[in-house]
């Protein structure tokens, strides 16, 4: 599904083309082997039906159709991903051990903090703001480097929820690094290897549309991003 009103599928993921939080849910659904529809909306011109069911006015939403044509709307990517993990068959994305599972959830929250810094990085319009955010991101990935003890994924051979959370973060840098060398991962070889492994995962590759890179570059241009000035 592309744009407009969501259809009557059992699961519909209400999306925006660039949103990393939407990508999280799309990756988890794909890893579980769950069929779902996607409905893309323009966040600058949100339709009335979206306002009616989205308390925070944000994507993603997961519309869950129940018996009798009753539809529940789940919001917040973390909630959606946990719901999918708990209700859908397929490979488990969380560890079975409670302590290990809690540790994974901690690094998921850390990934969300990286996304917050990444927003400031990509929208920085001057050299000082850009460099401050660049250093902050490099430092956070340095923390991640220290906990990566297995390969190719966060927990070794098994793709986990943590991988689904970090894959959209790394996708940003696939575009950024095609514009200019950010050097964010210069001191983190294990993170670089993890990033490469996630890039080749089908669920990750298919979580966005083919024009993702063009859309992100257009967004950077609209924001007068300093990253583009470096490239120039």
Region locations from a protein language model:
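GST superfamily/GST-like fold recognition
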Residues: 154-179, 184-193, 197-198, 208
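Conserved G/P- and acidic residue-centered "switch" motifs that form tight phosphate/ATP-binding loops
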Residues: 19, 163, 201
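GST-like domain detector, emphasizing the conserved glutathione-binding G-site
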Residues: 1-146, 152, 223-227, 231-232
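Short acidic/histidine-centered micro-motifs embedded in hydrophobic/aromatic stretches
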Residues: 107-110, 121, 167, 210-214
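Catalytic cores of transferase enzymes with a strong primary signal for eukaryotic protein kinases
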Residues: 75, 133, 185-186, 204, ...
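Long hydrophobic alpha-helical segments typical of transmembrane helices together
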Residues: 194-232
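Short, mixed-charge aromatic SLiMs
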Residues: 107-108, 140-141, 187-203
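Hydrophobic/aromatic-lined pockets within catalytic cores
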Residues: 85-89, 112, 149, 174, ...
């Amino acid at each position: 599904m592309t744009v407009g009103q969501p259809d009557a599928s059992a699961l519909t993921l209400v999306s925006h083309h660039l949103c990393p939080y939407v990508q999280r849910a799309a990756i988890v659904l794909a890893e579980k082997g769950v069929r779902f529809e996607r409905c893309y909306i323009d966040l600058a011109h949100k339709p009335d039906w979206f306002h009616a069911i989205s308390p925070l006015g944000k994507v993603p939403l997961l519309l869950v159709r129940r018996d009798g044509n009753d539809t529940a709307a789940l919001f917040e990517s973390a909630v959606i991903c946990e719901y999918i993990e708990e209700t859908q068959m397929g490979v488990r994305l969380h560890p079975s051990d409670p302590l290990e599972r809690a540790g994974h959830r901690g690094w998921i929250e850390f990934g969300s903090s990286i996304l917050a810094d990444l927003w400031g990085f990509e929208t920085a319009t001057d050299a000082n703001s850009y460099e401050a955010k660049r250093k902050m991101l490099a430092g956070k990935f340095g923390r991640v480097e220290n906990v990566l003890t297995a390969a190719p994924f966060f927990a070794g051979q098994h793709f986990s929820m943590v991988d689904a959370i970090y894959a959209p973060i790394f996708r940003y840098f696939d575009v950024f690094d095609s514009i200019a060398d950010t050097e964010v991962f210069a001191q983190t070889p294990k993170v670089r290897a993890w990033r490469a492994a996630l890039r080749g995962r089908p669920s990750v590759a298919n979580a966005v549309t083919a024009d993702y890179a063009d859309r992100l570059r257009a967004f950077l241009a609209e924001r007068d991003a300093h990253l583009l000035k470096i490239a120039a």
